[in-house]
Regions:
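Sec-dependent bacterial lipoprotein signal peptides
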Residues: 1-18
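Bacterial lipoprotein signal-peptidase II cleavage site
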Residues: 16-32
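Extracytoplasmic "Venus flytrap"
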Residues: 35, 40-66, 83-88, 187-190
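Short helix-initiation/N-cap motifs at beta->coil->alpha
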Residues: 81-93, 207-218
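Ligand-binding "clamshell"
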Residues: 114-122, 128-143, 224-227, 236-250
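A conserved helix-loop-strand patch within extracytoplasmic ligand-binding domains
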Residues: 124-181, 263, 282-286
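Periplasmic-binding protein-like
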Residues: 139-140, 146-153, 233-281
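Ligand-binding pocket segment of bilobal, Venus flytrap-like solute-binding proteins
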Residues: 178-248
Length: 317
């Protein structure tokens, strides 16, 4: 009886193994017949060449670099980030020499500092189109611009503004020439969006105190400077601690952000690459950018963490 039971079990196992083999063979034959490839990652960036993303040397750029990097990585792209490269003049050399493939830039800066155009476009759209045309002439292109724009501006303490009746940049001309000290990065001395433009458009002769970006507010607070070059999306400007002078002659231009990308890289990465970056840019309005800048500058949060939280909240990572 035991032999009979054993024989039945062995026969059953043999049939099961044969069935599995037949099933696997059938599946293989079906795949071969249809030409279906083996299962692969559904992420559009899987298997694409790695890209190198750069950013400049201040808080907003650190956040933008992380936003674009993490969004691309969520889609399967491999991204190497070169952070804190420096000013536009420096990072542009990294781009044109092939050290980086893309970076976020301000449209007005492209026109004034890279294309060396001093004629101001009529509006933000005109500035974007002119900047895009310039970049396409160099083998690059601009992706979509952000809703927010972050322009340079001159800020003063409210007491200083009240004492000297200052509301606009033009009002500084009422003060004795050379009596006003401005705190700004070293490149402010040679930029049209700096001493050159302020002189030609407003007739201002300002003394420059070179400062690393981020130290201008402390210099204002301690009366080391009378006015400072600031960015309009700085977290420090959320309250009423500082007065920002308006720029009626638009020396500081229109400054929406758009990624500059090598056209060769776009071609190699496929349409989802640009779509991913554009989806991030579309969410970056003035309020969102000010909040993220404040989180880093005032609350001392890590830019990578701030970017991660924003992307998650907006369904982008």
């Amino acid at each position: 009886m035991r032999r009979l039971i054993l024989a039945v079990v062995v026969a059953g196992l043999a049939l099961a193994v044969a069935a599995c083999g037949s099933s696997n063979k059938s599946s293989s034959n079906t795949a071969a017949a249809t030409g279906a490839p083996p299962a692969a990652s559904s992420k559009p960036g899987a298997g694409k060449p790695a890209v190198t993303l750069g950013d400049k040397n201040f808080t907003e750029q650190f956040i933008l670099g992380q936003l674009y990097k993490q969004a691309l990585e969520a889609k399967g792209y491999t991204v190497n980030l070169k952070a804190n490269i420096g000013s536009s003049e420096l990072i542009d050399k990294s781009l044109t020499s092939g050290q980086i493939d893309l970076y976020p830039e301000y449209t007005g800066v492209i026109l004034s500092e890279l294309a060396h155009q001093t004629k101001r476009p009529a509006d933000a759209d005109a500035a974007y189109q002119a900047a895009k045309t310039f970049e396409e002439g160099r083998g690059f292109t601009l992706l979509d611009k952000t809703p927010f724009f972050d322009t340079d501006a001159l800020a003063v303490l409210p007491a200083y503004a009240q004492k000297n009746n200052l509301k606009t940049v033009a009002d500084l001309a009422k003060l004795p020439a050379g009596s006003v000290t401005v705190g700004a990065p070293p490149e402010f001395a040679t930029r049209f969006e700096g001493l050159k433009g302020l002189k030609s458009e407003y007739g201002l002769t300002l003394k420059l105190k070179p400062l690393t970006i981020g130290l201008q507010y402390k210099a204002l607070d301690t009366n080391k400077v009378d006015t400072a070059d600031v960015f309009t999306t700085d977290g420090q400007l959320q309250g009423s601690k500082y007065t920002v002078l308006t720029d009626p002659k638009n020396v500081f231009g229109f400054q929406n952000v758009a990624p500059i990308v090598s056209q060769k890289v776009l071609d190699a990465q496929g349409p989802a690459f640009a779509q991913t970056l554009n989806a991030v840019s579309a969410k970056l309005n003035d309020e969102a950018m000010r909040k993220m800048n404040a989180a880093v500058d005032l609350d001392k949060q890590d830019p990578a963490k701030v970017a991660q939280q924003f992307l998650a909240a907006n369904g982008l990572a």
